[in-house]
Amino acid sequence: MIPDVSQALAWLTEHPEALKGIRRGLERETLRVTPEGELATTGHPESLGAALTHKWITTDFAEALLEFITPVDGDIDHMLTVMRDIHRHTARALGDERMWPLSMPCYIKEGQDIELAQYGTSNIGRFKTLYRSGLKNRYGALMQTISGVHYNFSLPLAFWQAKCQVDDAESGKEAISAGYFRLIRNYYRFGWVIPYLFGASPAICSSFLQGKPTKLPFEKTDCGMYYLPYATSLRLSDLGYTNKSQSNLGITFNDLHGYVAGLKRAIKTPSEEYAKLGLKKDGEYLQINTNILQIENELYAPIRPKRVTRDGESPSDALLRGGIEYIEVRSLDINPFSPIGVDENQVRFLDLFMVWCALADAPEMSSDELLCTRTNWNRVILEGRKPGLTLGIGCETAQFPLEKVGKDLFRDLRRVAQTLDGIHGGQEYQQVCDRLVACFDDPELTYSAQILRSMIENGIGGTGRMLADRYRTMLREEPLQALHEEDFRQEQAASLARQREIEAADTEPFDEWLAKQA
């Protein structure tokens, strides 16, 4: 089932310098909660600056859903230290509030009023809140409070120069983009390994079912927690943040122009379902438009091709201008065993897996074939730790034991690890392989198995509160290591000033401005 990458690995052994200079960044979402674990109803703390313009600390869907962003970094330890510093600073700024340490929230009732993230009075600020209003009206607010970690990754130019004989990023943008699309197709085929190893949402609170019947064979605890005994990441299931209405958009990952055309089509295609919601009610906008996607970011995907946008530029126009600059991996649950929701093991594994995905052959895939890859993901998401679980290739029936496929994959990853360890010195990448491959012999070592044991004993709420309290104490007491309090003070003031400048520069009424965004 695993493609033969022996030639590519031999090439890598001869060109180790091609992996010198991998760059990466992290984004982590977390809900602000009260000491009792309930969603905080306070506004975004002014001491954390303006969510619209802050470099490191912003908000996602809800006013209480924090998002932390590290700058692009070539050094794993430094990147994780910066992320921890952001957490340390925030923990001190939140007073009694805590950061929820799980992907799935718990103490949110059906129909509870969840305040949308607020970004001030500028047109762009109001637009961002309106987009979130559209998400709430389309999919329900509860689904939007699920948290995850995003890992951004780019291969060095030296890799593409050696692999595709490109001269520079500009003239080589088609070849580099084709290489990243190969990586993405392999991710769709084999990325289920991420929830298998690191999924940490095997259970949900009953409020997540919103009273709707489900075909999933949930077991229920006395405290009202629903769980699947072999599940890994219900966050990635249809109960979590996926969008079924997008499954037939026909977007493919074979080439830049085809991908962008599919994305632009979805933004322009009207939706009968969303038209029924209406655009306005009592003079207030309900959504940006009534199309299948309000904006490109609404496309649900476990991985995205990306390029840093210029002012006023859409993500797809940025891709057309300069090609793919990096990819964003979106399938990581919050790691409940880390105070910052992610750890070094995961980052090193993702480095290895991304390189493998870039090396392995990946035939082009139709949109139907892309949908078929979802079958393996769903198996792993819902019953990944089930003894004897099998996986399929493409649209064929499942016939390959997950345990064997996982071990075959790690045999390749270990060779990539030897190359990366050779560049950096030490054995860290190989040690990560040794630790993680054991999860295929013993699924009880996976994050989902470990956290489920605690959840069955203490409930989701009890587990979340216990970890939130522990991490709050730990982070508040730790000194900053990479950043300084002065850095945070300066960025807080600068972000508020930037927001005021944006608001002062706006002269156009919002309705007129919004009409031009279509």
Swiss-Prot record:
It comes from the Bacteria. It catalyses: L-cysteine + L-glutamate + ATP = gamma-L-glutamyl-L-cysteine + ADP + phosphate + H(+). Pathway: Sulfur metabolism; glutathione biosynthesis; glutathione from L-cysteine and L-glutamate: step 1/2. One of its GO terms (cellular component) is cytosol. One of its GO terms (biological process) is glutathione biosynthetic process. Keywords: ATP-binding, Glutathione biosynthesis, Ligase, Nucleotide-binding. The keyword Iron does not apply. GO terms for molecular function: ATP binding; glutamate-cysteine ligase activity; metal ion binding. It is an enzyme of class 6 (ligase). It holds the Pfam family Glu_cys_ligase. SUPFAM superfamilies: Glutamine synthetase/guanido kinase (SSF55931). InterPro entries: Gln_synth/guanido_kin_cat_dom (IPR014746), Glu_cys_ligase (IPR007370), Glut_cys_ligase (IPR006334). Gene3D superfamilies: 3.30.590.20. Its EC number is 6.3.2.2. PANTHER family: GLUTAMATE--CYSTEINE LIGASE (PTHR38761:SF1). Belongs to the glutamate--cysteine ligase type 1 family. Type 1 subfamily. This is Glutamate--cysteine ligase. It comes from Cronobacter sakazakii (strain ATCC BAA-894).
